[in-house]
């Protein structure tokens, strides 16, 4: 028959192992895990994605224009993904109507398709 010291040691070891396994399993859903994950994501720099052919004409930061020198049009929406478009006054006159029709076609399709899915 094992001694009481051996039984207590085995019992303590099994409790410690169960606690370690429980902590490892619960850390996935714990709030502390989410905080660590948010800290890791915040270290990544925000990237500005622009096609190479269009660089320099989308915003005043690229061409060195002073803010407020021209009328500007800015369109921004976020329906499955974030979309933002900035146009100067001349660009708005030139591309505004086709861009408006394009956005209307896209948004109108989603409005007409949404009730059909329900």
Swiss-Prot record:
Q: Which family does it belong to?
A: Belongs to the motilin family.
Per the UniProt record, the lineage of the source organism begins with: Eukaryota, Metazoa, Chordata, Craniata, Vertebrata
| UniProt modified residues of type Leucine amide | 99
Example of a GO biological process term: response to estrogen
Q: Which stretches of the sequence are propeptide?
A: 53-76, 100-118
Keyword Secreted attached: yes
An example Pfam family from this entry, by short name, is Motilin_assoc
Which segments show compositional bias classed as Basic and acidic residues? 32-44
Say which species the protein is native to: Sus scrofa
* GO cellular component terms listed in the entry, alphabetical order: axon; extracellular region; extracellular space
**What residue spans carry the region label Disordered?**
29-50
Entry keyword Lipoprotein = yes
Q: Where is the lipid attached (O-octanoyl serine)?
A: 27
- For the lipid attachment O-decanoyl serine, which residues are annotated? 27
For this entry, the protein name equals: Appetite-regulating hormone
Q: Where in the cell is it found?
A: Secreted
UniProt main location, coarse: secreted
Which InterPro entries does the protein's record reference? Motilin_assoc (IPR006737), Motilin_ghrelin (IPR006738), Preproghrelin (IPR005441)
Lipid-acceptor residues (O-hexanoyl serine): 27
Q: Which UniProt keywords apply?
A: Amidation, Hormone, Lipoprotein, Secreted, Signal
Q: Name one GO molecular function term.
A: growth hormone-releasing hormone activity
* Residues of the signal peptide: 1-24
């Amino acid at each position: 028959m094992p001694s009481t010291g051996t039984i207590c040691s085995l019992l303590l070891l099994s409790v410690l192992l169960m606690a370690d396994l429980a902590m490892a399993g619960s850390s996935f859903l714990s709030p502390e895990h989410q905080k660590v994950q948010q800290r890791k994501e915040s270290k990544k720099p925000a990237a500005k994605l622009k096609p190479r052919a269009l660089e320099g004409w989308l915003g005043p930061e690229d061409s060195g224009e002073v803010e407020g020198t021209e009328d500007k049009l800015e369109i921004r929406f976020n329906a499955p993904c974030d979309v933002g478009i900035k146009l100067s006054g001349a660009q708005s006159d030139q591309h505004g109507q086709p861009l408006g029709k394009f956005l209307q076609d896209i948004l109108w399709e989603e409005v007409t398709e949404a009730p059909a899915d329900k």
